[in-house]
A protein has these predicted regions:
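Short S/T/G/P-rich N-terminal loop/turn motif that feeds into the first structured element of a domain
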Residues: 1-49, 60-67, 81-187
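A short beta-strand-loop micro-motif that forms or neighbors metal/cofactor-
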Residues: 78
Length: 187
């Protein structure tokens, strides 16, 4: 499973345009295989920003969606017209924990890890950002990026201890922004 985390900062007054593109893309996205989960969240510290969080079966499914011509037109409109900034992180899930089950945290990769906690309340983690679902108010996700295995292990255990219902750790393969596209895939 692969996670995609699209943090976006629409220009003032452009959030409705973002959702117009979302509505236009829904039936097209439904035709693509591999999307497991999609929700949109507002950061608790910035009501003008948004996170689109997606889980995909594999990298090929993400590539197929990224290459869709209608989606590419929306991407271009976002970059050129609607967004002040964005950040996209993509990576494979390398660990999954719940209140009753867990994977071995000792086998995590060494760096570029993103700890993601899900639950009915924001989880307070060091250097993390918490978001509330736009589609399902009262559902939260907390993202904690960390560069080393030991810190990610501590944060994961702390999040479960705070009541996170579900926790996933992703090894980030690509991390790029509107202005730094050095890790962006080629069109």
């Amino acid at each position: 499973m692969h996670g995609l985390f699209f943090d976006v900062e629409p220009k003032p007054g452009h959030m409705p345009h973002y959702f117009t593109h979302v509505d236009r893309l829904k039936p097209i996205l439904a035709q693509h295989k591999g999307l497991v989960f999609l929700d949109r969240y507002r950061p608790l510290d910035d009501a003008g920003a948004l996170l689109s969080h997606q889980l995909w079966a594999d990298e090929e499914a993400i590539a197929s969606w990224r290459a869709d011509s209608t989606h590419r037109a929306s991407q271009s409109a976002g970059r050129k017209i609607h967004f002040d900034g964005y950040r996209i992180r993509v990576g494979a899930m390398v660990a999954h924990l719940t209140q009753t089950e867990s994977t071995n945290l000792e086998d995590l990769p060494a760096d570029r890890l993103l700890v993601v906690a899900y639950g009915r309340a924001p989880i307070l983690l060091a250097h993390a950002r918490a978001y509330e679902s736009v589609n399902n108010p009262g559902r939260f996700v907390t993202l904690a990026p960390h560069g080393d295995r030991a810190t990610a292990q501590v944060l994961a255990r702390d999040a479960i201890g705070q009541g996170a219902e579900d926790l996933r750790i992703f090894a980030v393969a690509r991390d790029y922004t509107l202005t730094d596209r050095s890790e962006a895939p080629n069109p």
